[in-house]
Amino acid sequence: MPELPEVETSRRGIEPHLVGATILHAHIRNGRLRWPVSDEIYRLSDTPVLSVQRRAKYLLLELPDGWIIIHLGMSGSLRILPEALPAEKHDHVDLVMSNGKILRYTDPRRFGAWLWTKELEGHNVLAHLGPEPLSDEFNGEYLQQKCAKKKTAIKPWLMDNKLVVGVGNIYASESLFAAGIHPDRLASSLSTEECDLLARVIKAVLLRSIEQGGTTLKDFLQSDGKPGYFAQELQVYGRKGEPCRVCGTPIVATKHAQRATFYCRHCQK
C-alpha cells in the first residue's frame, strides 16, 4: 500500500501540471472502487484546480466549489500523460486538462477512492487523524505522552492513524530498525530518550524516501511512470533471512495484526 512518501511523491509530481490548469472533463471507465466514485466527479466540466494538497495518505484537489479526495488504496498510482495515450485495463479514471495533459489513475485491485466533498473539515475519512509525522507537533515529547500508558507493541501503535498519520508497514519497520527498538516492545516501555530518537528517525526515514521517490515493491509508480527508488535502501523490510546490513545477523520476519514485521534480533532491543 502506498504510504506517506509515495503519496507525497505523487502530490509533488502532479501539482505543477494541475494547478493553474482547468479540468475539461472527467472520464470514468470503472467507478467501482473501494467506494463508488462520487457523482460530482462525473459531472466535472471547465473546473480550475486551485491547489494540490495532502493529508495523511489522502491527496486533496482543491476546486472552486469543493474538493476531490483521492486515496491510492493498495495498488493505485497517478500519472501525468499526453491526452492521446490510450487507456489500458486498470486505468479507471482520467482528468482531462486544458494544457493537453491527463491525470490518469491506475489501480489493479480497485481498492482506492475518488470522493467529493464541499468542506474538508469533518469529512469522515479525514476526521480523528493524528498529526503529520513531518510536522513540529510530532516530536519526542508528544510520542512519549501517547506511549506512556499504551500496553501494546510499538510497531502496530506507530501504524495507528490516531497516533500519527502515514507511517505504514514499511516505514514503521524501517524506523524501528534505525532507532534500535524491537517491534515487540510495549509502547509504554520506551524511555524519554528512545521516544525522542524514534520521532527523529521517523522524520528522517520518511524524508529520505520522499527524496528517492518513495518505495516501489510492486505497483506504485511516480507521476512520470518511474518507480520509487527507496526500495534499494531498505534495511529490514522484505529482507527475511538476508544478513543485516549492520551486523550480518539474518533478518527475522514475524506478524503483528496480520501485517508482516521485519527486524534484526541483534540490533533491535
From Swiss-Prot:
Look up the record and give one Gene Ontology term from the biological process aspect: base-excision repair
**Span of zinc fingers (FPG-type):** 235-269
Q: Which reaction does it catalyse?
A: Hydrolysis of DNA containing ring-opened 7-methylguanine residues, releasing 2,6-diamino-4-hydroxy-5-(N-methyl)formamidopyrimidine; 2'-deoxyribonucleotide-(2'-deoxyribose 5'-phosphate)-2'-deoxyribonucleotide-DNA = a 3'-end 2'-deoxyribonucleotide-(2,3-dehydro-2,3-deoxyribose 5'-phosphate)-DNA + a 5'-end 5'-phospho-2'-deoxyribonucleoside-DNA + H(+)
Residues involved in DNA binding: H90, R109, K150
**What cofactors are annotated for this protein?**
Zn(2+)
Task: Give a Pfam family name.
Answer: Fapy_DNA_glyco
List GO molecular-function terms, semicolon-separated: 8-oxo-7,8-dihydroguanine DNA N-glycosylase activity; class I DNA-(apurinic or apyrimidinic site) endonuclease activity; damaged DNA binding; DNA-(apurinic or apyrimidinic site) endonuclease activity; zinc ion binding
Q: Which Gene3D superfamilies does this one have? A: 1.10.8.50, MutM-like, N-terminal (3.20.190.10)
What EC numbers are recorded for this enzyme? 3.2.2.23, 4.2.99.18
Active-site residues, Swiss-Prot/TrEMBL: P2, E3, K57, R259
- List the SUPFAM superfamilies: Glucocorticoid receptor-like (DNA-binding domain), N-terminal domain of MutM-like DNA repair proteins, S13-like H2TH domain
Keyword terms, alphabetized: DNA damage, DNA repair, DNA-binding, Glycosidase, Hydrolase, Lyase, Metal-binding, Multifunctional enzyme, Zinc, Zinc-finger
Q: What does the cofactor section's free text say about binding? A: Binds 1 zinc ion per subunit.
The family note in this entry says: Belongs to the FPG family.
Q: Which NCBIfam families match?
A: fpg, PRK01103.1
Q: How does it assemble?
A: Monomer.
Q: What does this protein do?
A: Involved in base excision repair of DNA damaged by oxidation or by mutagenic agents. Acts as a DNA glycosylase that recognizes and removes damaged bases. Has a preference for oxidized purines, such as 7,8-dihydro-8-oxoguanine (8-oxoG). Has AP (apurinic/apyrimidinic) lyase activity and introduces nicks in the DNA strand. Cleaves the DNA backbone by beta-delta elimination to generate a single-strand break at the site of the removed base with both 3'- and 5'-phosphates.
Q: What protein am I looking at?
A: Formamidopyrimidine-DNA glycosylase
- Upper classification of the organism: Bacteria, Pseudomonadati, Pseudomonadota, Gammaproteobacteria, Enterobacterales
